[in-house]
Amino acid sequence: MKFKKTAACLAGLAFATGVVAKESNVGIFGTSGKGMGDHTYIAQDGPKADNIREVLSNVTLPEGFEINLYAIVPDARDMAMAPQGTALFVGTRKDKVWVISDRDRDGVADEVKDFAPSLTFDVPNGVQFTKDGFLYIAERNHVRLFPAAEYFFEGPDVVAVDI
């Protein structure tokens, strides 16, 4: 409980005072100041998806079980489902965090794109949500907090607070 109050106070303080993050490419309120930038999208169809589906069709499972391709995500390392189930965030050993959307909730990704392309990540292999919806991303040399990432992942420029 104390952690939740502390996290909420820190997030509120960051918004109220305009925290300037430690990185030189992150400005007031943790936005990059680079503008909106462009997302990188990963195609979920084509030869790569077909090859994966073919391999999966040869996997022997116990009766009543099935296996299907959910999403193609480059360099996937760690995953965290947003509290409301609207998006799955995926950390990597490279320089991107991916966000997967299954808007029609059919168990197949509708869209895979990079999260916060206006920011530079350094091995963001640890992603985790708190119960109250804060996304923490652990990188090689620091941790970032993204308040309400579940609701603002559609845009390329998001609020980020260095911890």
Residue ranges of predicted features:
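Gram-negative bacterial Sec-dependent N-terminal signal peptides
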Residues: 2-20
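Beta-propeller domains with acidic blade repeats across secreted/periplasmic ectodomains
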Residues: 22-163
